[in-house]
Amino acid sequence: MTEQFDSKTFLKTVTSQPGVYRMYDTSGTVIYVGKAKDLKKRLASYFRAQVTSRKTESLVKNIVQIDVTVTHTETEALLLEHNYIKLYQPRYNVLLRDDKSYPYIFLSADKHPRLAMYRGAKHFKGEYFGPFPNTHAVRESLILLQKLFPIRQCEDSVYRNRSRPCLQYQIGRCLGPCVKGLVSEDEYQQQVDYIRLFLSGKDQQVLTRLIERMEQASQQLKFEDAARYRDQIQAVRQVTERQFVSGTDDDLDVISVAFDAGMACLHVLFIRQGKVLGSRSYYPKIPTGTTLDEIVQTFLGQFYLQGSQNRTLPSEILLDFTLPEKDILSDSLSEISGRKIHIQTRPRGDKARYLKLARTNATIALSTRLSQQSTIHQRLDSLTKLVKLAKIQRMECFDISHTMGEQTVASCVVFDSNGPLRSEYRRYNISGITPGDDYAAMNQVLRRRYGKALDESKIPDIIFIDGGKGQLAQAIDVFQSLDVEWDKTRPQLIGVAKGSDRKAGLETLFFATEDKSIALPPDSPALHVIQHIRDESHNHAITGHRQRRSKVRNTSTLESIEGVGPKRRQMLLKYMGGLQPLRNASVEEIAKVPTISYALAEKIYNALKH
């Protein structure tokens, strides 16, 4: 415990009411946030003569100040605690690494409702179905739904400005409500009702209604309509047969935890209307010495209470562990949602099967993660010995990407001792250089990256430069000329050059501190970690360059065609439904656009293709 903090004097002033406390270090940074039913009793426990936890011992040594906020109830304290954790990200708290809001399928409340993926606060009128574990699951579902129930998925701006049906109508993926006369209001609303029932888990009602429609069409001798309903029935049946359904309309989150070697995996199974929407594994950042109870309690608080306004909470949460403050969490979630939310730890029947499934997934996911971490640490140890450092905590790598010198993008990727830190990846648009001058591009990105104040924790131990001696020379020149307060001599500069035929495994390393190069054997663990960070940087640069190039092309391709002015550009995009359908169109299809002659259509076709 530091001499600066007088715990005895402080504790005399603390109330015994419920509330939240924030602990600060010498720099004024919040290092821990906690809550208590009795603030005085809880805070006194940190300053006992004997502290059994290594984590608590380390925490107390760094405390120089404590602030408390009194609340009316424990529930208020729990909510405030997790708001503070999200705000301050204290290093001694268990931190959920990914607190993005979850994606939903959104059915709008328009005259002709649209189906779309949505993430964020629910400001728009309509219905939200989910949550889904990730955007990929939503996109897959939207593709499937478009095949089953062809209602529109286009943006309102496109829908309102159409005079002819787009490609989705032509291939049977949309009924074309944008064009009058293609579909009746009743028929479109039918499909919307089917989607609403289907997403609510009422598959049998959908099938019953479709069968009634098919029989009705057949009796009226409308055989084409009957055949269409028949195909739709078959498609819905194929989908429902593939789904694991509990036979009930359960809305559940099923959570299991696996804990080993200082790492935890919490696996969440999302079940809505009796259907498994998907699952996701979480690996929270855990301070050394943290107990499993604290890991679980903090994870659940952050998972459900942070960003709860954007989330549809389930009616029940199943856990495979005893929760010390189960009632407080249940009351808090019930208060937020406006309905009772139950937390169960000993379910039976189908619910017990769900819990067993989550437990199996948590165990497998943690085992896989530990295996990967072991491999990463072995490779990092090998690299540490190669570069003769005591330890490596942070590495950064740079690459340049462009096409014939145009739309040049530089990438910077960051690795720590556990692998990629993707949240810290950055891209830099390069400008003001001679097109194609990779040396100047590298010089510019390094000056922009390092020619400013850096926190001690952000100074890399190694900087890899994708390139040979020339690129490394640029890095050396930049660092020699830097006028900064942080230790610019700390990072080791290493150039990574591929062999003459640019095959992986034939890389040559150039060191700024030594006038020699090294070619590591292909099976070298150190080489593998270098290849990994170099490939990440390369891919990050290429992706950024392609996005920048695509953006430029999308706005400039049509503008560069002689005879295509603003009005014709607008007509082409409006008639074809956007640039991508226009790219895919034939000369004959382009020539059907009003004011576009066949000769001009050929010119447009060739410009877009070449």
UniProtKB/Swiss-Prot annotation:
Domain of life of the native organism = Bacteria
Family named by the database record: Belongs to the UvrC family.
Q: Which SMART domains match?
A: GIYc, HhH1
Species assigned in the record = Photorhabdus laumondii subsp. laumondii (strain DSM 15139 / CIP 105565 / TT01)
Task: Name the PANTHER family for this protein.
Answer: UVRABC SYSTEM PROTEIN C, UVRC/OXIDOREDUCTASE
- GO molecular function annotations of the record: DNA binding; excinuclease ABC activity
| Cell compartments where the protein resides | Cytoplasm
What's its job?
The UvrABC repair system catalyzes the recognition and processing of DNA lesions. UvrC both incises the 5' and 3' sides of the lesion. The N-terminal half is responsible for the 3' incision and the C-terminal half is responsible for the 5' incision.
Record key words, sorted: Cytoplasm, DNA damage, DNA excision, DNA repair, Excision nuclease, SOS response
Subunit architecture: Interacts with UvrB in an incision complex.
Annotated gene: uvrC
**Record keyword DNA repair present:** yes
Q: Where is the UVR domain?
A: 204-239
NCBIfam families the record matches: PRK00558.1-5, uvrC
Protein name in the entry: UvrABC system protein C
**Mind telling me which InterPro entries this protein's record contains?**
GIY-YIG_endonuc, GIY-YIG_endonuc_sf, GIY-YIG_UvrC_Cho, Hlx-hairpin-Hlx_DNA-bd_motif, RuvA_2-like, UVR_dom, UVR_dom_sf, UvrABC_protein_C
Query: Where's the GIY-YIG domain?
Result: 16-94
